[in-house]
Amino acid sequence: MRIRFRQISLLGILFSSAILMQSCGVLAWLGIVCADVARCSDVKFESFEHSWVAPPEERQVHLEHLAVAPFVGDIRMAEWWATVLSQATDRHVISPAEVSSRLPPNVLTQLTQSTTDQDDIALAPQLSRDIQVDGVLFGRVVGEPPQKAFWGLKERCPQRLFLHLVSAEGILLWKAELPFTVVKGKKEVDEEMAKRDLLTHITTHAKELGWTELGLVAVHTAS
């Protein structure tokens, strides 16, 4: 009887230990996951706002070749847009890096100082001539003060992208605003994932943005 009691006690101890070890394993796994999440950075795109398309009589242009100018305040975002536009439309898109390499220094300086759609309209004809394109997409990113997030381990940076598409003749064809938030951890943003998210965002809202009216037909959708 005493031996049986000892056996039962031993089994109880082993069972309790197994549960405790399993719990510790789960806690350790959760700790690793939380630590990794705390280090990661990401970008969240909100809904487009204040979209506008030129009336039919002003947008009778064929946008076969487009250039994406370096965005004021965020060069990387301009590169993302160039990549995504080449995937989302059937147009030939020239990247900001190539635009910069083909422009004289004084024009590049003007680009960095551009703050309004009128500045972009004034610059578009010269850029279009120098790069041989039918239109230029301009962008300007304005940010708000960063906020602490994830118990102070990350920074949350709300930002807004102002977009202007101007024809080679200096006609404003389309404009919109895209609010987005960058959450900064110790790791850099996964740019491929961010571009996939942006592609999905654009193709999902292409019609309501007025791209169909401009002849910018979406030819790819993100999976």
Tell where the protein language model's regions lie, with residue ranges.
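Glycine- and acidic-rich phosphate- and metal-coordinating loops
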Residues: 137-145
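Extracytoplasmic/secreted cell-surface and envelope-processing proteins
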Residues: 146-151
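C-terminal/domain-edge helix-coil "capping" segments
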Residues: 24-63, 127-131, 143, 155-160, ...
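Solvent-exposed, acidic/flexible segments
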Residues: 74-78, 113-121, 152-156, 184-195
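Bacterial N-terminal signal peptides
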Residues: 11-22
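Bacterial N-terminal signal peptides that target proteins for export
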Residues: 2-11
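N-terminal segment of the mature soluble domain
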Residues: 62-138, 172-175
